[in-house]
Amino acid sequence: MIHMRTGVIGVGHLGRFHAQKYAAISQLAGVFDENAERAAEVAAELRCRAFPSVDALLAEVDAVSIVTPTSTHFAVAEVAMQAGVHCLIEKPFTLDTEEADALIGMAQERHLVLAIGHIKRVHPAIQYLRQAGFGAPRYLEAERLAPFKPRSLDIDVIMDLMIHDLDLTLLLTGAEPVDVRAVGVAAVTDKADMATAWMTLNNGTVANLAASRVVREPARRMRIFWQDRYASVDFLNNTLHIYHRGAGTVPGIPGVRDEAVDLAKRDALAAEIEDFLNAIAAHRPVFCDGVAGRRVLAAALQVRVAVEAFLQR
């Protein structure tokens, strides 16, 4: 148990999960949602308060998750930080980099922890690859495909799904995109529901990322290539295989060895929230801070510009 008063602003589908995790590992003071009935339902489930306003909640907590529509992230986080409350903001960070910069500056001035919910960073496969010492990859490809669900329709598939793989690309390479090309289609909603992006980073790495929220069968895969090996990650099935050049064990592919990495199963959201609270308590960096969240947002906005140009052709 982490002895810290916590709260959740926005307890829709994802916000409810945030509240459950806080209730398990901290002192959950309560929740707020514009839908008072929904807030009361979650509060009853978790035996906490349903606050009548954001301000009322902020007066009773030390840290908060902001799980509201992206268009409201800036305004809600600004009020929270003005109240001296540490913030975990669900991805995407904000609508634009100007809003992100303002929140980063405010957090620094007030010595507050600002975390952005890029949850795939805590996946065991990504943590293993970051610690493996393979260096920056030469090429990455990822596909993140999901059946249509009537959620997160205030944003396009780039900010909804592709942003996860954009974050992992920047994290694994430590580089920035310098050339971005992309296509997309608004198949079901009025925003891009599928998109493919090709990008070159300033260290020479090339990435090819595909995302869709209108498929029948889900898939979440990434393949990462170095000069003498490549890794295949299946996020859906929690598997990691690393194929090394050398003494062969792969049938039909001479000189290639398959290393199946044993990955632990973990509750990613609980790990993310626990890291956030421990960062506050220990005065240490968080798993994904505002600066990192801004980098990913900037890359996603570059992809969006390219997709919108394609849609207008």
Swiss-Prot record:
It comes from the Bacteria. One of its GO terms (cellular component) is membrane. The keyword Metal-binding does not apply. It is an enzyme of class 1 (oxidoreductase). Its EC number is 1.1.1.374. GO terms for biological process: lipid A biosynthetic process. It catalyses: UDP-N-acetyl-alpha-D-glucosamine + NAD(+) = UDP-2-acetamido-3-dehydro-2-deoxy-alpha-D-glucopyranose + NADH + H(+). GO terms for molecular function: nucleotide binding; oxidoreductase activity. NAD(+) binds at H13, L14, R38. Keywords: Lipid A biosynthesis, Lipid biosynthesis, Lipid metabolism, NAD, Oxidoreductase. Changing K91A: Loss of activity. The keyword Signal does not apply. Gene3D superfamilies: Dihydrodipicolinate Reductase, domain 2, NAD(P)-binding Rossmann-like Domain. Signal peptide: none annotated. Pathway: Bacterial outer membrane biogenesis; LPS lipid A biosynthesis. SUPFAM superfamilies: Glyceraldehyde-3-phosphate dehydrogenase-like, C-terminal domain, NAD(P)-binding Rossmann-fold domains. It holds the Pfam family GFO_IDH_MocA_C3. Belongs to the Gfo/Idh/MocA family. Oxidoreductase involved in the synthesis of 2,3-diamino-2,3-dideoxy-D-glucopyranose (GlcN3N), which is a component of lipid A in some species. Catalyzes the NAD(+)-dependent oxidation of the glucosamine 3-position of UDP-N-acetyl-glucosamine (UDP-GlcNAc) to a ketone moiety, forming UDP-2-acetamido-3-dehydro-2-deoxy-alpha-D-glucopyranose (UDP-3-oxo-GlcNAc). Is specific for UDP-GlcNAc, no activity is observed with UDP-glucose (UDP-Glc), UDP-glucoronic acid (UDP-GlcA), UDP-galactose (UDP-Gal) and UDP-N-acetylgalactosamine (UDP-GalNAc). Cannot use FAD(+) and NADP(+). Structural data in combination with molecular dynamics simulation and mutational analysis suggest that Lys-91 or His-164 is likely the catalytic base that deprotonates the 3''-OH group for the oxidation reaction. Exists in multiple oligomeric states. This is UDP-N-acetylglucosamine 3-dehydrogenase. It comes from Acidithiobacillus ferrooxidans (strain ATCC 23270 / DSM 14882 / CIP 104768 / NCIMB 8455) (Ferrobacillus ferrooxidans (strain ATCC 23270)).
